[in-house]
A protein has these predicted regions:
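A short SAM/SAH-binding and catalytic strip from SAM-dependent methyltransferases
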Residues: 39-61, 76
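Conserved SAM/SAH cofactor-binding pocket of Class I
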Residues: 1-44, 54
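Active-site capping/gating segments
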Residues: 79-121
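Short, well-ordered alpha-helices that flank and scaffold nucleotide-derived cofactor binding pockets
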Residues: 14-17, 59, 88-91
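Conserved beta-strand segments of alpha/beta enzyme cores
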Residues: 23-25, 73, 94-95
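Conserved beta-strand signature within the Rossmann-like core of class I S-adenosyl-L-methionine
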Residues: 64-83
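Short alpha-helical
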Residues: 6-7, 48-52, 81-84
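Short, well-ordered coil/turn elements that cap or connect secondary structure elements
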Residues: 21, 36, 69, 90-93
Length: 121
């Protein structure tokens, strides 16, 4: 788990410890500065436009999938209209509307965008 804000990472480290999670490594670093590691999934809230975010992470995926239903890729929490932004990048994606799963007004415009890793096909 990555965030540039130290207070957030401190909380995440405590949660990881309290839950006894073994496959989580919180790091205080900016996503665009991650260069050496590869990941199965990259999960993010919309920190910037996808055209800026995608180049930061596109080479950061492991080739072997760990999930039967989803191949490795990006899960991106985003509000508003995502289609125009994503279609401009010519990427395959699936948009999950959170209002289909949660009733609170906050989720009415929120989506999780799944972009599968395309590098192994």
């Amino acid at each position: 788990l990555v965030d540039s804000i130290g207070k957030k990472i401190s909380v995440v480290k405590d949660v990881v410890k309290q839950l006894g999670l073994k496959n989580v490594e919180p790091q205080q670093v900016r996503a665009e500065n991650l260069m050496s590691r590869k990941y199965h999934f990259i999960v993010s809230r919309a920190v910037t436009q996808m055209e800026k975010f995608y180049p930061w992470v596109k080479g950061r995926f492991r080739k072997e999938d760990v999930h039967d239903e989803f191949q490795n890729g990006i899960l991106y929490l985003k509000g508003g209209d995502v289609d125009e932004e994503l279609e401009a990048l010519h990427l395959n994606y699936v948009c999950y509307h959170l209002e289909d799963y949660f009733r609170e007004p906050f989720f009415e415009t929120k989506k999780v965008v799944y972009i599968p890793f395309e590098g192994k096909r």
